[in-house]
Each structure stands twice: as C-alpha cells, then as structure tokens.
Amino acid sequence: MAKKVLTQIKLQIPAGKATPAPPVGPALGQHGVNIMQFCKEFNERTAKDAGLIIPVVITVYSDRSFTFITKTPPASVLLKKAAGIESGSPKPNKQKVATLKRDVIRKIAEQKMPDLTAATLEAAMRTIEGTAKSMGIVVED
C-alpha cells in the first residue's frame, strides 16, 4: 500500500548549506520530520553546486518519512552568476547593469529546460531573456 502524503514543503536553500536553523528547521519540525537526516542528505546531493540557491520540494508522509526533489537554481541566480553581478538593476528600463551574449543565455536555458514549461529551446531562451531584461541585463547576439 502506498504511503499517505501529509504535505509538500517548498524551500530555497543554498547548496550544501542546509542547517537545522530557520528556515529549514521550523518548516520541517512542525511536520515531525528528522531535520538532521534531511540536512545531511540535501548537503550530500547538492555539494557540487556550492554557491547556488537550490529550490527543493519535500514530500512528507503520514509516517513522518520524507522524500525530496531538488530543482535547478532560479534563472535570476544563474544570470547573476554568469554576469558576475551581486544584484539586478533597481531601474531595469533606465539603468543596465551587465551585458550577456546569446550563447550564455542558451546555456542557461539548456540547464533550466527540465523545470521550464517551454516546449522548445528557443521558447526557453525567450523566457530567460525576459528574466534578464527585467534584471537590467542586456542580451546581445
């Protein structure tokens, strides 16, 4: 018989740095999940992505066991890393903070493809370009 799903918890945690401190501890503790076990498994699974923020969906079952799925980092985090900037522009229409080539956008779109609803790579690239534009990053050919 399948386990009964109690809840799903969505968090964004820095790769390899999950600790029982907030936001992880309280979110998992209120559902009776073994926090240290989650932190250990998450840190092992995301050690190679150090420095990135990793979205995670934790499914908690009625017997207090859990499973989790890690997703690709948010597009904004990948764009900031590629452009070498700390944050996007406060006025993206007037003040541009960086310039990226289209091939960099293509690489980010390929990486994000499993988590995007886009049917083609070109559609995924347009999605990433829209995110870049809203952050004040110029995309060149």
UniProtKB/Swiss-Prot annotation:
Keyword Hydrolase: no
GO biological process: translation
One Gene Ontology molecular-function label: structural constituent of ribosome
Any one cellular-component term (Gene Ontology): cytosolic large ribosomal subunit
Post-translational modification: One or more lysine residues are methylated.
Gene3D superfamilies to which the protein is assigned, alphabetical: Ribosomal protein L11, C-terminal domain, Ribosomal protein L11/L12, N-terminal domain
Superkingdom classification of source: Bacteria
Keyword rRNA-binding annotated: yes
Keywords: Methylation, Ribonucleoprotein, Ribosomal protein, RNA-binding, rRNA-binding
Function: Forms part of the ribosomal stalk which helps the ribosome interact with GTP-bound translation factors.
Subunit field text: Part of the ribosomal stalk of the 50S ribosomal subunit. Interacts with L10 and the large rRNA to form the base of the stalk. L10 forms an elongated spine to which L12 dimers bind in a sequential fashion forming a multimeric L10(L12)X complex.
Family classification: Belongs to the universal ribosomal protein uL11 family.
The protein, known as: Large ribosomal subunit protein uL11
Organism of derivation: Caldicellulosiruptor saccharolyticus (strain ATCC 43494 / DSM 8903 / Tp8T 6331)
